[in-house]
Structure formats: structure tokens, C-alpha cells
Amino acid sequence: MNLTHLDEQNKPKMVDVSDKDNTTRIATASGIIEVGQAAFDAVIANTAKKGPVLQTAVIAAIQGTKQTSTLIPMCHPLMLTSVKTDIEELPELPGFKLTVTAKLTGQTGVEMEALTGVSVGLLTIYDMLKAIDKGMVIRNVQLEHKSGGNSGDFNRA
């Protein structure tokens, strides 16, 4: 297997994308946080002591998406053109599903940015609710869709 992040001497390197075409690239990722009923109720009633949980998670998800290259060593700094978020209430768990879609026109994909945005957003929910519930579970952080670039499209079935 040829790993693109290793050079001929097996040393880590950032992939050279300078010869790639600029194309529109979109990636959507999602993840779930399961919380206890008291934590869920605090979010819905907007009574969590640290403030508005879901609004803060959205801002954190956008920031996480933008900061991916500072967190993941081999990710290129990207000029994102759009970051969209959605948080779905899951009262049956109880919990929340966070979805992040990142978009750009450039030479490399935005999958890691969407995944990082989801991760940071869910971690923010955890941070803001940990005084109420330490047993929260973050799960199923995954790529849902990707389009653009040489590797083709991906859609989770």
C-alpha cells in the first residue's frame, strides 16, 4: 500500500497538492452525544449553568472546522467557503445529533474539516454539561457524504 503521507524514506510529509485542479469539494459529517435526562432537559430549557449549550456548540463546530490544520498535522490550511451546522434533538436517547457540512473550491478535500467540526461541537456539549452528567457518550462520528476531487464521491448508505 502506498501511503501518500510518507516519503521514500518512510518519513512523514504533507502531500503536495499543487498540481491538482481547483474543484468544488463538499463534505458532510455527523455524530451523536447521548446525555442523561437531566442534562437533556437543561439544554431544552436553556438552564445549563455555562450558558446556551446548542448555540455554543454550533460556534465551536464552526471554529473546529476552521482550525483543523492546526490540530491534525498533515491537513492543509484551507480557504473554506462555507460551514453549515445542524443540531437535531433526540429525545428518545436522550441526546443530540450534530451535522457539519464544509465546502470550498480548492485542491484538496474537506472531510477532515467536517469531522473535526463535529468532534469539537460534541466535545463542547460535553464540556458544558459535565457538571450535570459525567456519563455522556460521544459516538458515531462519521463521514456521511463527500463530493469533488479525484477520489470520487462517497455517500454513506
From Swiss-Prot:
It catalyses: (8S)-3',8-cyclo-7,8-dihydroguanosine 5'-triphosphate = cyclic pyranopterin phosphate + diphosphate. NCBIfam families: moaC, PRK09364.1. CDD domains: MoaC_PE. Gene3D superfamilies: Molybdopterin cofactor biosynthesis C (MoaC) domain. It comes from the Bacteria. Pathway: Cofactor biosynthesis; molybdopterin biosynthesis. GO terms for biological process: Mo-molybdopterin cofactor biosynthetic process. Its EC number is 4.6.1.17. This is Cyclic pyranopterin monophosphate synthase. Catalyzes the conversion of (8S)-3',8-cyclo-7,8-dihydroguanosine 5'-triphosphate to cyclic pyranopterin monophosphate (cPMP).
